[in-house]
Amino acid sequence: MAANMYRVGDYVYFENSSSNPYLVRRIEELNKTANGNVEAKVVCLFRRRDISSSLNSLADSNAREFEEESKQPGVSEQQRHQLKHRELFLSRQFESLPATHIRGKCSVTLLNETDILSQYLEKEDCFFYSLVFDPVQKTLLADQGEIRVGCKYQAEIPDRLVEGESDNRNQQKMEMKVWDPDNPLTDRQIDQFLVVARAVGTFARALDCSSSIRQPSLHMSAAAASRDITLFHAMDTLQRNGYDLAKAMSTLVPQGGPVLCRDEMEEWSASEAMLFEEALEKYGKDFNDIRQDFLPWKSLASIVQFYYMWKTTDRYIQQKRLKAAEADSKLKQVYIPTYTKPNPNQIISVGSKPGMNGAGFQKGLTCESCHTTQSAQWYAWGPPNMQCRLCASCWIYWKKYGGLKTPTQLEGATRGTTEPHSRGHLSRPEAQSLSPYTTSANRAKLLAKNRQTFLLQTTKLTRLARRMCRDLLQPRRAARRPYAPINANAIKAECSIRLPKAAKTPLKIHPLVRLPLATIVKDLVAQAPLKPKTPRGTKTPINRNQLSQNRGLGGIMVKRAYETMAGAGVPFSANGRPLASGIRSSSQPAAKRQKLNPADAPNPVVFVATKDTRALRKALTHLEMRRAARRPNLPLKVKPTLIAVRPPVPLPAPSHPASTNEPIVLED
């Protein structure tokens, strides 16, 4: 009974999907809906698999610092892997979930420097947290403050003075006297002066337009003038005027008008006060977060002062009473029976008895976590095409802690690695490529990428390094191995060392004499080999009446034999390949063209035309151009004398038909 009773403040497991791990949440409120169901307002806690890899590395560095400072005992790699499943990240994100999705209780504690990490592995359903995750900003912050110890943060305590020894320090620089208790005024005179100061403050608010809007009544103005800011200013005025009441009175009411003193309660507008109440409802008394997210234009001191003044108002008292009444009306606890429905991921073997799970388990397939071959129940785990499964104990571990007991390749790490990554960070193709059950052919398909055209633009220092550090760079060898890495930092350092010495002997540049394109084209045309003539024998006479002979068969059979010989009975598809047997091309549309594999697509070729090539085009007739396009592998014979710019052919003048007065008739 007590195990199924859940109260406000409990850490519980929530199940949002049958194939995903449980969600760890803290119950903040239990509300009853109009339908009679119970909803739980919970605080979200995140696992390592829920955050990015960069934040995981940040959490790893924080864990290493904690182990060094607290001098944790050494743990094995498997224990370190399981400790990452016990670490959670607190957040300030709230959500509402049905109470019927609760699957059990757990314990979450703040990591203390006196804790031993290995103790968390000995306890069931036990987690810890030390960092706070912000789902919006994607940041990790420490949840607790730090004690600054050292001479940099502590004050230096001077030695005690001997009796009769004077203090040679300048007291005016160290402190300022704001009130003298041995003043000549009596307590009655001081109280009368404070009453006058309140009256001056009330009169000043009546003259001020903005104050008259905020405090429309005399009672509200008098209450605002009676706050501590007015009394502190009056007492400071007495101290500065040597406790002379006449001088102090004239200071309160100068020539320009009475002095108006305002505190944070009057400086803040109504909208800013509403923002503060909303932030206080969300963050509590975390003034740094309130200032950062809601009131960035206010100083931290201003927010703290407003908070303690706001607690003295009637609005705070009313809200406190309303919250107490709501807390009394809300549910304090809820009873959720144990969830007994079977999980959809259970594997029911073919031929097994009803109610038995895993009876006919296939040989050769083991648990992905503990590699056992026998279990009372088996559960499908991972992508469906992988056919991975877990035993009953490993499935419960996966649901509670969001990982496997041992790091596997499907989780994103090789067995024995020190830092396995969560499988939740991998897509399905990546998980398949890392799985031991994926064939090499499938991996090759996954690694295939589309070819992209790129431009490599080098700097002057890189071009110098090619010549000065040729022995280290080995450009010819590197060109044959474009995927082998090159230590650019070492070559850059060596180039900077050799650069001062090489400046004395400048490099000799041998310019290449490049012939014009027209000359190269003429040489290619002259050197083009002649097309070899194929030997042609005597033509075999064809007996045209041979096909029409009967040869002992009927007319219909002769026609079919002729169609078979001529090839008319073999239909061809749109891409030139014969259709498969059983497909009729006459009654069905043409077959779909085959698509090229992106990895087999040819590289783009760009042909830049010049004046000479354009002249060659003009020297050819339209028929020769089409013949050359059909046979691009054969050389093209062009007479050099024909390479000349032909005079432009005058266009014939358009002939306009003579206008007639006869009507134009359009026939359908």
From Swiss-Prot:
Domain of life of the native organism: Eukaryota
PTM sites of type N6-acetyllysine: K152, K460, K522, K531
Stretches assigned to the ELM2 domain: 145-256
Composition bias, Polar residues: 409-419
Modification sites for Phosphoserine: S52, S54, S433, S435, S548
UniProt-listed SMART domains: BAH (SM00439), ELM2 (SM01189), SANT (SM00717), ZnF_GATA (SM00401)
Domain spans labelled SANT: 263-315
Function: May function as a transcriptional coregulator. Acts as a component of the histone deacetylase NuRD complex which participates in the remodeling of chromatin.
Protein family according to the UniProt entry: Belongs to the metastasis-associated protein family.
Descriptive protein name: Metastasis-associated protein MTA2
Upper lineage: Eukaryota, Metazoa, Chordata, Craniata, Vertebrata
Gene: MTA2
